Swiss-Prot record:
Protein name: Y+L amino acid transporter 2
Protein's job: Heterodimer with SLC3A2, that functions as an antiporter which operates as an efflux route by exporting cationic amino acids such as L-arginine from inside the cells in exchange with neutral amino acids like L-leucine, L-glutamine and isoleucine, plus sodium ions and may participate in nitric oxide synthesis. Also exchanges L-arginine with L-lysine in a sodium-independent manner. The transport mechanism is electroneutral and operates with a stoichiometry of 1:1.
Alphabetized UniProt keyword annotations: Amino-acid transport, Cell membrane, Membrane, Transmembrane, Transmembrane helix, Transport
Lineage: Eukaryota, Metazoa, Chordata, Craniata, Vertebrata
Main location class: membrane
Assembly behavior: Disulfide-linked heterodimer with the amino acid transport protein SLC3A2/4F2hc.
Any matching Pfam family: AA_permease_2
Species in which this protein is naturally found: Danio rerio
Record-annotated membrane-spanning stretches: 7-27, 41-61, 77-97, 130-150, 162-182, 198-218, 229-249, 274-294, 326-346, 348-368, 386-406, 414-434
Catalytic reaction equation(s): L-lysine(out) + L-arginine(in) = L-lysine(in) + L-arginine(out); L-leucine(out) + L-arginine(in) + Na(+)(out) = L-leucine(in) + L-arginine(out) + Na(+)(in); L-glutamine(out) + L-arginine(in) + Na(+)(out) = L-glutamine(in) + L-arginine(out) + Na(+)(in); L-histidine(out) + L-arginine(in) + Na(+)(out) = L-histidine(in) + L-arginine(out) + Na(+)(in)
Extracellular side: 28-40, 98-129, 183-197, 250-273, 347, 407-413
Family: Belongs to the amino acid-polyamine-organocation (APC) superfamily. L-type amino acid transporter (LAT) (TC 2.A.3.8) family.
InterPro entries in the cross-refs: AA/rel_permease1, AminoAcid_Transporter
């Protein structure tokens, strides 16, 4: 048995757009403005970030149609450089990237949902954490029930967040037509000339563009992936780039620099200045955006763990699917459990600082693998074949992106590297070591879990999808 191909072109576009447009564009686009120090330069950096992300997404489109396995960078690194480096990538995602990002998104959703009830103070800690936990559990149930349920939820919430941003953009255009153009006069005045500051501004923009690889996590479930994967990317990336630039133009038309930099939620401040009695809709839009982003993150992460288990890098139980619903329920439940554990960490937002280096390192390594496979397997069928200029330029830029956190946030970056390297002994003891030499209690425990899962929950192991 295998996962069913149920993700259409429209679903693919919704997954990419829904994951890329999270809370960032509503809450904290000021990161780019802080380091660029001018409206004009900040818009240029948003455009550069969009172009860079388009190049990366196109490279992933070639990889996804050449290596038709789910798992995104994990699958591509495994194919190019072998199991050890792929496991370290998987271990980093399991231990820090996926559960941390999902916990943060869920908490942000909960805070914006209950904020109207506590207009003059922070929402209670326990209330926001319980709502966040309920959100994660509900989305896990939806995606466990049917793949179509998860994609329909994604479609609805993607439409909602795009509609909210269109409202902001139209409001900004109206203000510009009314003569609110003072912030765009001499818009490059005061621009930062510090290479380090410009680098950090670009890094902030690229953080908001992250998520363009979402569809590559579910390649095996896409209908006609040779067509729909690259087409979904080609449609999604310009949409997000244009929306981001126009949304920032709208913010700049209404708010001066001091107001933007002082705001904890720029979209909410914008709504307070322009939407009057309807300003309450924007916090709700932020919550909906977080909900949709969390859903796409859960879909992607569960497939990553599913593929990792199928490759023998995680327990076999996680590679099972329901015999009737064709959903990777054990992987979804495992992902849910990890996210719930991280909800108990009081300063979970601090954990985000640990994985910027690892994220870009493994993305760059995936695309370096694209170049390597061109040399190693030149005759391999490639439904989409880009000029080598694209992956080479992207890899050179990733060297810069990996160097930035080492320079600007050395301690947190070193902690992130240590977290990744903690997977080395796990790999050699649990995977590289022959099964006969592993502790018998571990082998028996994993076998018992697999049998229990099969016999009591109607799950079966899946076959490897080897179609290239």
């Amino acid at each position: 048995m295998q996962l069913k191909k149920e993700i259409s072109l429209l679903n693919g576009v919704s997954l990419i757009v829904g994951n890329m447009i999270g809370s960032g564009i509503f809450v904290s686009p000021k990161g780019v403005l802080i380091y660029s120090a001018s409206y004009g330069l900040s818009l240029v950096i948003w455009a550069i970030g969009g172009i860079f992300s388009v190049v990366g997404a196109l490279c992933y489109a070639e990889l996804g149609t050449t290596i038709t396995k789910s798992g995104a960078s994990y699958a591509y690194i495994l194919e190019s450089f072998g199991g050890f480096i792929a496991f370290i990538r998987l271990w980093t995602s399991l231990l820090i990237i996926e559960p941390t990002s999902q916990a943060v998104i869920a908490i942000t959703f909960a805070n914006y949902l209950v904020q109207p009830l506590f207009p003059t103070c922070e929402p209670p800690y326990s209330a926001s954490r319980l709502i966040a936990a309920a959100c994660i559990c509900l989305l896990t149930f939806i995606n466990s029930a049917y793949v179509k349920w998860g994609t329909r939820v994604q479609d609805v919430f993607t439409y909602a967040k795009v509609l909210a941003l269109i409202v902001i953009i139209i409001t900004g255009i109206v203000k510009l037509c009314q003569g609110f153009t003072i912030n765009f006069e001499d818009s490059f005045q005061g621009s930062s000339r510090d290479p380090g500051g410009i680098a950090l501004a670009l890094y902030s923009a690229l953080f908001s563009y992250s998520g363009w690889d979402t569809l590559n996590f579910v390649t095996e479930e896409i209908k006609n992936p040779e067509r729909n994967l690259p087409l979904s990317i080609a449609i999604s990336m310009p949409i997000v780039t244009i929306i981001y630039i126009l949304t920032n133009v709208a913010y700049y038309a209404v708010l001066d620099m001091s107001a933007i930099l002082a705001s904890d939620a720029v979209a909410v401040t914008f709504a307070d200045h322009t939407l009057g009695v309807m300003s309450w809709t924007i916090p709700i839009a932020v919550a909906l955006s977080c909900y949709g982003g969390l859903n796409s993150s859960i879909i992607a992460a569960s497939r990553l763990f599913f593929v990792g288990a199928r490759e023998g890098h995680l327990p076999d139980a996680l590679s099972m699917i329901h015999i009737e619903r064709f959903t990777p329920v054990p992987a979804l439940l495992f992902n849910c459990a990890m996210a719930l554990i991280y909800l108990t960490v009081e300063d979970v937002f601090q954990l985000i600082n640990y994985y910027s280096f690892s994220y870009w390192f493994f993305v760059g390594l995936s695309i370096a693998g694209q170049i390597y496979l061109r040399w190693k397997e030149p005759d391999r069928p490639r439904p989409l074949k880009l000029s080598l200029v694209y992956p080479i330029i992207f890899c050179l830029c990733v060297v810069f992106l990996v160097a930035v956190p080492l320079y600007s946030d050395t301690l947190n970056t070193l902690i992130g590297i240590a977290i990744a390297l903690s997977g080395v002994p796990v790999y050699f003891l649990g995977i590289h070591l022959p099964e006969s030499k592993r502790p018998p209690i571990i082998t028996k425990l994993l076998s018992a879990i697999t049998r229990f899962t099969q016999f009591t929950c109607f799950y079966v192991l899946t076959e490897m999808d080897t179609v290239d």
